[in-house]
A protein has these predicted regions:
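Active-site-adjacent pocket-lining segments in enzyme domains
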Residues: 747-751
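Glycine/proline-enriched, intrinsically flexible loops and inter-domain linkers
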Residues: 1-4, 8-746
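Single conserved hydrophobic/aromatic residue that forms the stacking wall/gate
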Residues: 2-7, 753, 758-759
Length: 759
């Protein structure tokens, strides 16, 4: 099991939103593939300026924020939907400084049976095979481009640096690598990312001779340099023993994949690239291993302002303004309408969260699917049998806190990501982190290095304090447009492993239950007291395991009021806030704290655990939020919460004029045969663009059928003829044909099946 990041595509997404976001996901999938991991779930976290502002206010040399957020969402979702990857969590963070450069980051979860992962050395004589997509000029300069400062002319000159994604081809690579007999032939593997052939193949052995003339091309006319550095997508390089080359190429052909031997491992430690029979690169490995010139810099750390302490201010200014006027209802409603609190359901619904049939949590929970989940959870993608093992992933980050203090921002990013895992039923002691950093462009100015230095120090301190490591990450230091810088960004992704039965969901369950706040202890500098937090999270996990806590929500800087409303929306239950709760308690910063729903008859369990807690309120049947004399109906709260981004990411379809047929047949009962003696054969054809064959196969096998799948090969006329003949035989022997869903030329193929007569 592993996770992978995709921060590097903030640059191309700013230039070409659709393609840049698509390659963000494609690149993230390829990295676990190099370890033979099958990616089964993705998390998308993005940053933008306000997308509701008029287009007329767009900066010169920039695309409008509305264009960026819509285009990037379309690109990422298109790629994920085509390749058949569930996007389990989607969140867009809004901050005015992301107008400098959009943030497009995320993470994916991948897994593979341990027996399938072979890691050996490359020996002289070994062959390197390039498989997958062809090479073109798209992506030339993408690696260096991602580190450029953006100017007024970047949008006109950097378009060629954006790669063109090809999800169906990458799906074929996934299928190939998922076959045990294939993965065990691979001695070493590398994906094609930044640097293209020169890096992907150049990293596989100390001595290499690469024949660039053998690299498959999208079109003629590419010179040696372009072939060597192009970052065209969906390509992999594998090292195999010479005796296994033909076998590997045969397996690739079965999956309808191009595969070509392009390099050989040599005894002499030199990297040689040949083009048209002549070497155009011939470098000593010792020189490459120096990693370039040694560099040092001075750092001058900015101390956060005590007067501007983020923990002493309202996270949403409109809330503070309303509270000064004595308008608690107005403050609560304004909070729900804030860009970083409001519903993003229109955005989330652009993504397929259920493909693969492994997702445990949907993005929104409850009877009305209105309570947003904070953690994505999925079962491991086993091909045979069943599993109750699940993986969990969450994120933590607040750009406003980080802008005040990058150190505190990183500390609480780690803490918040942990709290979300714990609130979903995870065991914090098993958590591992991976960080993504995104900062302004660095120069020789010592003050500009303050942000990454302070942020990394904060993340390091949090890891040491909690005793939990970060095992990966990515960074970018190019978040500058002219004189505008992105906010200092360190996003913590927390990953955990749990059992299916341990998971709890955040929507309120039952009227009469109590809402309880567990608060973390902080020192005089507003830093969490790590040992106390660890003890608290451990006890909360025990309470979720034994059923005392039935739902929970990790608080953020927006406080209790936002969390109470979001927990209530899913089942449209109300909450009566206790009279002892102050407005400060309702709206203050709650980073690291957890709000939990507990049945009234189980409250004694908190005393047994010797837990400090505050009773916030009681769940009610009537869908109203009551606080003293203040009453907010469910409808009022939902209107405020759902209206903010409706014009950017609509959730309401245009009303049709045609009457909907109401004569729908409804069966009183479903008959399932108990005596499964006969095993009908189901034939599932796998066409280019198909992506549901695995879950379809498992569904039929659970029902007692025998399933046969075949890939339709179309690289040559002979492949097509052979495939037609094979399909004809398989259809003749089958009782059912099932055409799984997928994409062909971007068009959805609907689920359908044919039952064949038997004679």
């Amino acid at each position: 099991m592993g996770s992978e990041m995709c921060i590097r595509d903030s640059h191309p997404t700013e230039i070409e939103p659709f393609g840049g976001a698509a390659t963000c996901l494609g690149g993230a999938i390829r990295d676990p593939l190099s370890g033979r991991g099958y990616v089964y779930q993705a998390m998308r976290v993005t940053g933008a300026a306000d997308p509701t502002v008029p287009v007329s206010e767009t900066l010169h040399g920039k695309l409008s924020q509305k264009k960026l957020v819509r285009g990037a969402a379309s690109g990422y979702s298109s790629y994920g939907n085509q390749i058949g990857l569930a996007t389990g969590f989607v969140k867009e963070i809004y901050h005015p400084s992301y107008v400098a450069k959009r943030m497009e980051i995320g993470a994916v979860m991948g897994a593979a049976p341990r027996r399938n992962v072979i890691r050996e050395t490359s020996d002289p004589g070994d062959i390197i095979i390039l498989l997958g997509g062809r090479t073109g000029r798209d992506g030339c300069g993408g690696a260096t481009g991602s580190s450029k400062v953006h100017t007024d002319t970047s949008i006109e000159t950097c378009g060629a640096e954006v790669q063109k994604g090809n999800a169906p081809t990458e799906r074929k690579i996934q299928r190939l690598f998922r076959r045990e007999e294939v993965s065990r032939l691979i001695k070493k593997c590398n994906d094609f990312g930044a640097g293209g052939v020169s890096v992907a193949i150049g990293e596989l052995a100390d001595g290499l001779t690469v024949d660039l003339d053998k690299v498959p091309k999208k079109y003629a006319g590419l010179d040696g340099t372009e072939l060597a550095i192009s970052e065209s997508q969906e390509r992999m390089a594998v090292v195999v023993d010479p005796k296994d080359v033909d076998t590997f190429l045969g397996y690739a052909k079965e999956e309808n994949l191009e595969a070509v031997p392009v390099a050989v491992v040599t005894e002499e430690p030199r990297l040689v690239l040949n083009w048209r029979g002549k070497p155009i690169v011939d470098l000593k490995r010792a020189f490459l291993d120096t990693n370039g010139a040694h560099q040092e810099t001075k750092v001058k750390v900015d101390i956060p302002s005590e007067e501007e302490n983020y923990f002493d201010k309202w996270a949403v200014p409109a809330v503070g303004e309303k509270l000064e006027e004595g308008d608690v209802k107005g403050a609560w409603v304004a909070l729900l309408n804030d860009l970083n609190v409001c519903s993003q359901k229109g955005l989330v619904e652009m993504f397929d969260s259920s493909i693969g049939a492994g997702s445990v949590l949907m993005p929104y929970g409850g009877k009305y699917q209105l309570t947003e989940t904070q953690t994505m959870v999925a079962k491991l993608p086993v091909l045979e049998g069943k599993t109750d093992t699940v993986t969990m992933m969450s994120y933590g980050f607040d750009p406003y806190l980080s802008s005040w203090s990058p150190y505190h921002g990183a500390v609480y990013a780690v803490t918040e990501s942990m709290a979300k895992i714990v609130a979903s039923g995870g065991d914090f002691s098993k958590i591992r982190f991976t960080f993504q950093e995104y900062f302004r462009r660095m120069t020789s100015d010592p003050e500009r290095w303050s942000q990454p230095f302070a942020a990394l120090l904060g993340a390091y301190d949090a890891q040491i304090g909690f005793g939990l490591p970060s095992i990966g990450g990515k960074d970018s230091m190019s978040g500058t447009f002219n004189d505008i810088d992105v906010p200092p960004t360190l996003v913590s992704f927390a990953v955990d492993v749990a059992k299916y039965g341990d998971i709890i969901t955040p929507e309120l369950k039952t009227p009469g239950n109590k809402l309880v706040r567990f608060s973390i202890n902080k020192d005089d500098f507003d830093i969490p007291m790590y040992e106390n937090v660890a003890e608290l999270y451990g006890k909360i996990h025990e309470l979720t395991e034994n059923g005392t806590i039935v739902s929970a929500y990790a608080l953020d800087s927006k406080g209790v009021a936002a969390a109470v409303a979001k927990m209530a929306f899913g089942n449209k239950l109300g909450v009566k806030i206790d009279d002892e709760v102050t407005t400060d308690d309702l709206f203050d910063n709650g980073l690291g704290d957890i709000l939990a729903e507990i049945p009234a008859d189980k409250m004694a369990a908190l005393e047994e655990k010797e837990l400090d807690y505050t009773v916030i309120g009681t769940v009610t049947e009537e869908p109203v939020f009551v606080y003293g004399d203040v009453k907010i109906t469910m409808e009022e709260a939902l209107v405020s919460w759902t209206s903010k981004l409706e014009k950017v990411f609509p959730t309401k379809a245009v009303k049709g004029t045609e009457a909907v047929a109401s004569n729908v047949y409804k069966a009183d009962s479903i008959y399932v045969c108990k005596h499964k003696i006969a095993k009908p054969t189901v034939f599932i054809p796998v066409f280019p663009g198909t992506n549901c064959e695995y879950d379809s196969t498992k569904a039929f096998e659970r029902a007692g059928a025998h399933v046969e799948t075949r890939v339709f090969r179309n690289m040559t006329a002979e492949d097509i003829r052979e495939s037609v003949e094979e399909f004809e035989k398989s259809i003749a022997q089958a009782q059912i044909i099932m055409f799984p869903g997928g994409f062909s030329a971007g068009d959805a193929v609907s689920y359908t099946h044919l039952t064949l007569p038997t004679t």
